[in-house]
Swiss-Prot record:
The gene is ynfQ. This is Protein YnfQ. Coiled coil: none annotated. Probably uses the non-canonical initiation codon AUU, which may limit its expression. Part of the Qin prophage. Belongs to the YmcF/YnqF peptide family. Induction: By cold shock, 10 degrees Celsius (at protein level).
């Protein structure tokens, strides 16, 4: 079990987020949303799955 989960925004590639119990869903089990564009955050363990599904580039620049 890890104590730290790294999130990344698929839209703006930001890594700052907020969590809320109101945002928890099947697609967003942690309830994490980007503080900049309000998109659902994804974790790095499922980022390849997300990128293949939406055909985004793998550039994760800050």
């Amino acid at each position: 079990m890890t104590n730290h989960i790294h999130f990344r925004c698929p839209c703006c590639h930001g890594s700052q987020y907020r969590t809320s119990s109101f945002d928890v869903s099947d697609m967003n089990p942690f309830g994490a949303k980007c503080i900049f564009c309000k998109s659902m955050m994804i974790t790095f363990d499922n980022i390849s799955q997300y990128l293949n599904a939406s055909r985004l580039s793998l550039d994760l620049k800050k």
